[in-house]
Amino acid sequence: MTCSLVFIKKRKIWGAIFKKIRTNRLVRVFFGCLAAVACGMLYAVYLSTYHDRKFWFSTKQELEREITFQEGSGLYYYYYKHMLAAPSFERGFYELTIDNKTVSGQTINAVERLSLYPELIASFVYRVTGSQDFVEPVYFYVGAVFGLQAVYVTALFVCSWVMSGTWVAGMLAVAWYVINRSDTTKVDHALPLRDNWALPYFSCQVAALTGFLSNNISSATEMFCYLTMSATTFTFLLVWEHSHYILFIQGLCLFLLDSFDLVPPRKVKTAAVGSHLISVGRHVVTPASVALGQPMKTDHRLEDGQIGEQPEVIYHVFHTLFFGGLALLFEGMKYLWTPYVCMFTAFGVCCPGLWMTVFKWVKLKSIHPVTTLIYMYISLFTTLLQYCPRVLAELSDLPEFYDPDTVELISWIRSQAPVAAVFAGSPHLLATIKLCSGAAVTSLPLYSDVNLLKRTEDTYQVYAMRSAEDVYKLLTSQKTNYVIIEESICNELSFNKGCRIKDLLDISNGHVVYDKGEIYSFSKHGRFCHEIKMNYSPYTNYFTRVFWNRSYHVYKVNSVISFQY
């Protein structure tokens, strides 16, 4: 009887202890989620304020607002406008699938070719929610992008939090992300670009994968992470045409995890798309390790001075290394690499387990957990105190973005050019022309389409050393009515020889001579963009200047050649 009472008493005590632990865990999770959402919302508000102050967005007219969509990104916003202007969503979608009003002489499926699914979803939500009664279309579109950026930083917060066990690491990751904003995102100047829509989904996928790879999660949490991973991966593939390259790198990271037995095979086979590749890799790497004298021990523990019990950490090590290598080769990859460097660095600063492992590696005594906690808070507050004034100062001292020459050009096209006119020029400028005037163009800023790339190369011959007749034939083959020559390309100055557009054209056309290590361009014809401004024959036989300002010269391609001498 006495033993039974003692047993019941102990069970009650342990039950109370477990209940208290569970309550504390729920409280920590609640405040961590609250902090993550707060960081995301604050970042979205910051981006909105920064964007408005940089472009004076709220005080501009519609034309000047649309010109702020740079790097050819305005083309995507044009299709969003088109969907809203259509009588119905179904009709607008059908018109985009048989679009013959964008690229001259071609009928394209714009939805598939340009991955317009974000614009379709945004226009559908704008219609069904009745948002047209209280918000302008452009603000709804911009707000959707900023909302996704909030999701982006929230996912980074969660990644660092899951690995380190403290949401202080998440706050530090977000702080460093904002501080390095110029290297983490292009949302400042090219809102509609596909990567601004796609990378938040990839960030959510990485956060879900981080949780999925963790060993200390329940089966319900594991299933939630798996479903989140599947949904975000599908969306990522749908939105961005280059997403499969990123997922391939991610597959390599998982391949290495499985090859070195750092994660249960069940998880990798569930998570990885290329599970057959991973299985082959295991059969190759494992025997090689044994042949080199390595024991087949897989149950690594922190007590052994290893972090094998945290496969999510090893995954992020591989992730950071692979994307870092690509960032060294391609500058554009820094937008994929830097955010995860910020996140992983925050984890490294705030993870007590990692510090214990490092100290065991170097044969030093472990530090007290309270000391680690103090160090984390010092790092966070030092970062905030040092960089917060600079970040806030960016909102108060921004030069006004104003492009009067482009505004003048678009105004002339709207008022003077025929409705059915076809324009040729650089892809980025043509995207702006398409957005602001709706005119047909000869090419688009889409660099995965070989046909469009060939059209762009033919149009760029206006900056090469080609005859007037050659350029005329190339332009008329594209049904061009007007060609726009940009001073920034024609008179481009660069310290790197051979990297300008006109240098590349000279090399492609065989108009280059090498002499004692120096590169010289040579042709029996002068550079077209210079010669045509002289306004003499034979250039005036084929082209007639109809508009010019400091930045642009617009020439009409004569339908009837008039020979003047």
Model-derived segments and their meaning:
Residues 97, 143-262, 266, 271-283, ...:
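Membrane-embedded helix bundles of polyisoprenyl
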Residues 321-323, 327-370:
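Hydrophobic/aromatic-rich transmembrane helices and adjacent perimembrane loops
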Residues 274, 302-328, 341-344:
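Transmembrane alpha-helix segments characteristic
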